[in-house]
UniProtKB/Swiss-Prot annotation:
One of its GO terms (molecular function) is chloride:monoatomic cation symporter activity. The gene is Slc12a8. This is Solute carrier family 12 member 8. InterPro entries: AA-permease/SLC12A_dom (IPR004841), SLC12A_fam (IPR004842). It comes from the Eukaryota. It is a multi-pass membrane protein. Residues 486-495 have a biased composition (Basic residues). The chain crosses the membrane at residues 38-58, 69-89, 92-112, 121-141, 159-179, 181-201, 232-252, 268-288, 306-326, 368-388, 390-410, 587-607, 612-632. Belongs to the SLC12A transporter family. It is found in: Membrane. GO terms for biological process: inorganic cation transmembrane transport; potassium ion transport. Residues 472-512 are annotated as: Disordered.
Length: 705
């Protein structure tokens, strides 16, 4: 019977089948469940779509088209998605070299730029997630208060606090319930989007500005016409949080079965689908509604929908799901920062509960910060704060990939990328249970293979106690030997052979593995094991080799064996060519970082300077509190030195080729003065003069220039 994987979304049924099979006593895990791991579509794609579909899409798309017009609005939406796409590609490029862990953005940046910079950007990203969650909850509370006829600001705040506490309980229940709820919410969002598209050409509502399709209306809405106090960059700052959920897949790397494949595919698919839906929303609203209704009525899309209740349901669900996504990713980043001891004051956040290491303390802390910003109670005030923090994070992700590429291509030899680790991949030089224990934090590559007494104990027990099937086969093979007639024919076994049979050891191989796990070993070791079994079978058939001479057998060098296995594993685990590899360009990442930096100052230069000042303070504080952090794989690359190498030669006056003269180095002019130690004597006149000494001063050795 094939053994089913327990790492599924609904794994209770699979667990029953697995627990029914007998296991050795040293492998039984009491009071412990297997961690729940997810894939590309149920994990990454769902989380990204839930985070991208937020309040901004349902409440501010019409306002965007009313100010910028249809043409410029489509360009603005495409530009926002392009900035997010460049960041996703940069993150994929960094992850291809360093892997993906549960730390997400923090782990990527700290592995490239060092723990000090990674901790700074990670804290800013967590802060931005908290503010974004407050913005989503506030938008949800505004809609509920308008629906109930409550215009008081404290009613909005009360609803927001109640919703935040409910989402806090769901997050504390575990990641399994978060993903299950997200699948249902994504289905309801698809229904509400379809309701909006169908309603745009099935009915009209002229009283609220919904007059239907007409070429004249589309022509009047094609050009921008801003409201008083608004501009292109203010509209951009309000709409940019619509693309802040693209990094949600990177933040859940520790809860994925194969993050190296799931994160790139799921993130790119979510960005493409989101861009298409944004274009549909913006074009349809500009083609069927008047400009006055678009700029004044934030719920104009609800009038366009066929069933207004379904659209409001999608709005409420998107608000809750986006906030829940922020409450999921931010605490795990804080947990990784605490586990790496970047900030000693946050050490109490390192512990987790359950098999998935749910960060309970970090979830409570981020919920308190979100509740503090819920008291602001205005979406347009919170949106620029979210924009600045997320753009700072995106700038650092883009720069990380650029610095990593420059450090590996220009200043240092390019190492081989980390091979993709599948769920069933097991190397012969690793522990047998290494793939069963998921890793959390950004220090996974630095861990030694010898850590963990449980793994060592299990491996030792597997070496000494072989499976039951092999024992039964040996018993069947030895029935003939138990016959008294056959026992007389056989000679007496030697001491070495008796010891080998009693402990079931294999003296010919450096390692001994159980039969059930032999299918997961590398090709090299399997070949050696099969050849050795054939040799043992041939020896048992002959009577002349009952006691093998182990001293004459060549022993396999342990280091050579592991080196051979690693070389063959590199050939087997070589990464296949993927379609998104050609899109990861360091120069595009640098251009995206510079463009994002410029847009930050244009949107809100005051918020930008304040955020940079806070980032500088946190950076220097981490340097003082934890001076021994990892420097990063791109520590030998300096952006200012790189700029200097380009700018300084261009600023100097270039000399012609005829004026460049190359002189060969001339040896130093040193005068040798001989001093005779003894007087001349005729007795030794035939001998050569030996034992002479000379003294050279420092000035004589150094010629004058």
């Amino acid at each position: 019977m094939a053994q089913r994987s327990p790492q599924e979304l609904f794994h209770e049924a699979a667990q029953q089948g697995i627990l029914a099979q007998p296991q050795p006593w040293w492998k039984i895990q009491l009071f412990m469940w297997e961690p729940v791991l997810f894939g590309t579509w149920d994990g990454v794609f769902t989380s990204c779509m839930i985070n991208i579909f937020g309040v901004v899409l349902f409440l501010r798309t019409g306002w965007l088209v009313g100010n910028t017009g249809v043409l410029l609005g489509l360009l603005l939406v495409s530009f926002v998605v392009l900035v997010a796409l460049i960041t996703v590609l940069s993150g994929i490029g960094v992850a291809e070299h360093g892997g993906i862990s549960s730390g997400g953005v923090y782990s990527m940046i700290s592995s490239v730029l060092g723990g000090q910079m990674g901790g700074t950007v990670g804290l800013l990203y967590v802060f931005g997630q908290c503010v974004a969650g407050a913005m989503y909850i506030t938008g949800f509370a505004e809609s509920i208060s308008d629906l109930l006829g409550l215009g008081d600001i404290w009613a909005v705040r009360g609803i927001s606090v109640a919703v935040l506490l409910a989402l806090l309980g769901i997050n504390l229940a575990g990641v399994k319930w978060i993903i299950r709820l997200q699948l249902l919410l994504l289905l309801l969002l698809a229904v509400s989007t379809l309701d909006f598209v169908v309603g745009s050409f099935t009915h009209l509502d002229p009283e609220h500005g919904f007059i239907g399709y007409s070429p004249e209306l589309l022509q009047s809405n094609i050009l921008p016409e801003y409201s008083p106090g608004e501009s292109f960059f203010t509209v951009f700052g309000v709409f940019f949080p619509a693309a802040t959920g693209v990094m949600a897949g990177f933040n859940m790397g520790g809860d994925l079965r194969d993050p190296a494949d799931s994160v790139p595919l799921g993130s790119l698919a979510a960005v493409g689908v989101s861009w298409f839906l944004y274009i549909i929303f913006a074009f349809l609203l500009g083609a069927v509604c008047t400009r006055e209704a678009l700029r004044s009525d934030f719920l104009i899309a609800e009038k366009v929908s066929l069933v207004g209740f379904l659209f409001l349901l999608g709005l409420y669900i998107s608000s809750l799901a986006s906030c829940m996504g922020g409450l999921y990713g931010a605490p795990r980043i804080l947990q990784c920062i605490a586990q790496d001891k970047v900030i000693p004051a946050l050490a109490f956040l390192a512990n987790g509960k359950g098999p998935n290491k749910t960060p309970v303390a970090a979830i409570c802390l981020t919920s308190l910060v979100t509740m503090a910003f819920v008291l602001v109670g205005q979406v347009n005030v919170l949106a620029p704060v979210v924009t600045i923090n997320f753009m700072l994070t995106y700038i650092m992700v883009d720069y990380s990939y650029f610095a990593l590429s420059m450090a590996h291509c220009g200043l240092a030899p390019s190492p081989e990328p980390v091979p993709r680790q599948g769920p069933d991949t097991l190397h012969c030089s690793e522990h047998l249970l290494q793939d069963r224990a998921p890793s959390y934090g950004s220090d996974v590559p630095a861990r030694s293979l010898s850590e963990g007494t449980l793994l060592e104990f299990t491996k030792d027990m597997d070496q000494f106690l072989q499976p039951i099937e092999e024992l039964e086969s040996r018993q069947l093979g030895s029935r003939e030997g138990n016959n008294p007639k056959n026992q007389k024919r056989k000679g007496k076994k030697g001491a070495k052979q008796t010891l080998q049979d009693s402990f079931l050891l294999d003296p010919g191989s450096p390692l001994s593995f159980p039969t059930r796990t032999s299918e997961r070993l590398s090709v090299a070791f399997c070949g050696e094991q099969e050849s050795y079994q054939k040799q043992q079978t041939s020896r048992s058939e002959s009577h002349d080799h009952l006691v093998p001479d182990l001293r004459n057998q060549p022993r396999v060098n342990r280091e050579d064996f592991f080196l051979k296995c690693r070389l063959q594993e590199q050939e087997i685990q070589r990464r296949p060519s993927v379609f998104y590899a050609c899109m990861c360009n360091p120069w595009v990442s640098l251009l995206g970082a510079l463009a994002s930096l410029l847009i930050m100052f244009v949107i809100q230069w005051l918020y930008t300077l304040a955020s940079m000042g806070v980032a500088a303070l946190v950076y220097f504080y981490i340097g003082q509190a934890s001076p021994g952090l990892y420097l990063g794989s791109a520590s030998n690359f300096s952006f200012f030195q790189w700029m200097k190498s380009f700018l300084v030669p261009s600023c100097r006056s270039l000399r012609s080729a005829q004026e460049q003269i190359i002189l060969a180095p001339s040896p130093a002019k040193v005068d040798m003065a001989m001093t005779q130690l003894t007087q001349d004597n005729a007795d030794f006149a035939t001998r050569d003069r030996y034992h002479h000494s000379s003294f050279l001063s420092r000035e004589q050795l150094m010629p004058p220039y």
